[in-house]
Regions:
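C-terminal ends and interior cores of transmembrane alpha-helices
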Residues: 75-94, 294-308
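A membrane-interface helix-boundary motif in multi-pass transporters
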Residues: 96, 157-174, 371-395
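Multi-pass alpha-helical transporter architecture, strongest
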Residues: 55, 83-89, 174-188, 359, ...
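Cytoplasmic helix-loop-helix junction between adjacent transmembrane helices
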Residues: 105-143
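Juxtamembrane intracellular "pre-TM" segments in multi-pass secondary transporters
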Residues: 1, 185-220, 245-250
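Helix-loop boundary and gating motifs at the non-cytosolic
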Residues: 1-50, 214-250, 257, 261, ...
Length: 415
């Protein structure tokens, strides 16, 4: 089978696993009486990302071939996610938060590092095969978005967003991906057997990137954009779902199929990914990130203004700009980091980026978003418009600060 096709299948499966529950699990938690804990479930993704991606990246760089470690992560993530589904099935609406949370946390502790490993495995295989990363990686990665959309739609059509079956589907797909990973080309560790310093021994060389001013600023703003990402992951579908309580929107398509409406965000991703090579080569990482930040401002603003009735076009616009907001940082940023480091640090540097976005960014974003939502909730009713305006103002401040502070030389950031 063609190598690019094999990597595209891996990308499809990687994000199909996540798409099965990421955008709709808030609906399930609300149904079982855990609505006030939604932020905690998203925050734990950030907490485990504070150390697991970097740790697994170090292991992949030094001791265990990345593709084998990648498969192991999915074996463990899938097993624990199936336990989440089993527990939900067994106890229904009587689930205990601490037990459900613990099982979920164990699963994402292994899934989150698989995200960074999927990139490093792909980059390693492409490099060894002489494939142009800037030209061909976006075409491979787009299948990840397609996989995410596919399981989102499947979950919505089967009404799994209301129950624990979304986790069962995710767990099953993880186990399939574990088996598939066993067939991937080898990604040999890059480390020599020579004597190393203590920093070398613990694989902390990736943190030396902070010695470069432009990389330090880049990683700090990666945290700020990670906050934006997990605000929308945690509450966008819950926001759309709340219109079910309003009679005037009862028959609206977005109310009947909130996950399908939300999946327009991922459809936008599939197109925007293909724009990355052009924008990165022509405009560089700073301008691409500024475009992403402006898109986050518009994303939150349109959500605050829209509704499933005569304002549905604003909701659709918010889904469209999400593709720009996500891809123009997450994908471009990953490629930028890969080009900025030594091949020996490929996995650990991707883990470091994951630490910033899905570690600190996710933890801070989830907790802040939950606090804002709770502060604007009265008698069980959330003042969503105010919440989205607050989030839009935050994204605007981040954008302005980045424009002023991040000043790399043009030749350093054109890939």
């Amino acid at each position: 089978m063609n190598l690019k096709v094999r990597l595209a299948i891996m990308s499809f499966m990687q994000f199909a696993v996540w798409g099965a529950y990421l955008t709709c699990m808030g609906i399930y938690f609300s149904k079982v009486g855990l609505g006030s804990h939604i932020g905690s479930f998203f925050a734990v993704q950030g907490f485990v990302s504070l150390f697991m991606p970097a740790l697994m990246g170090i292991v992949a760089d030094r001791w265990i071939p990345a593709q084998r470690l990648y498969g192991f992560c999915h074996l463990m993530a899938g097993s624990f996610m199936l336990l989440v589904a089993w527990y939900g099935q067994t106890y229904g609406t009587q689930v205990d938060f601490s037990i459900l949370f613990s099982l979920y946390a164990a699963s994402v502790a292994f899934y989150m590092p698989s995200l960074a490993l999927s990139y490093s495995v792909t980059y390693s295989i492409m490099t060894r095969a002489g494939i142009d990363i800037v030209k061909d990686f976006p075409r491979i990665r787009v299948f990840g978005t397609i996989g995410f959309i596919a399981t989102m739609w499947l979950v919505d059509i089967l009404n799994f967003e209301q129950n624990q079956n979304q986790f069962a589907l995710s767990g099953f797909l993880s186990l399939v991906l574990f088996l598939y990973a066993l067939t991937l080309p080898a990604c040999p560790v890059n480390w020599s057997g020579e004597k190393k310093t203590l920093v070398d021994a613990f694989g902390l060389q990736a943190f030396s990137l902070f010695k470069q001013k432009k990389m330090t600023i880049f990683f700090v703003f990666a945290i700020f954009l990670g906050v934006c990402l997990h605000i929308t992951n945690g509450f966008a579908t819950t926001f759309i779902d709340h219109f079910q309580t309003m009679p005037q929107y009862a028959d609206a398509f977005g109310v009947k199929y909130p996950v399908v409406l939300y999946s327009m965000s991922q459809m936008s991703e599939t197109f925007c990914i293909l724009l990355i090579p052009f924008f990165m080569r022509r405009y560089g990482i700073k301008n691409v990130m500024l475009i992403a930040m402006l898109a986050w401002v518009l994303r939150f603003l349109f959500l605050g203004l829209g509704n499933p009735g005569n304002g549905v076009w604003l909701l659709v616009l918010s889904m469209i700009v999400y593709g720009i907001a996500f891809d123009f940082f997450n994908i471009s940023g990953s490629m930028f980091v890969d080009k900025s480091v030594d091949p020996q640090l490929r996995s650990s540097s991707q883990g470091l980026l994951m630490l910033m976005t899905n570690g600190f960014g996710a933890t801070i974003g989830s907790l802040i978003a939950q606090a804002v939502v709770n502060a604007h909730t009265e008698n069980g009713v959330v003042e969503w418009t105010t919440c989205w305006y607050i989030f839009a103002a935050y994204a605007f401040v981040v954008m302005v600060a980045f424009a002023v502070i991040f000043r790399p030389k043009r030749e350093e950031v054109i890939l």
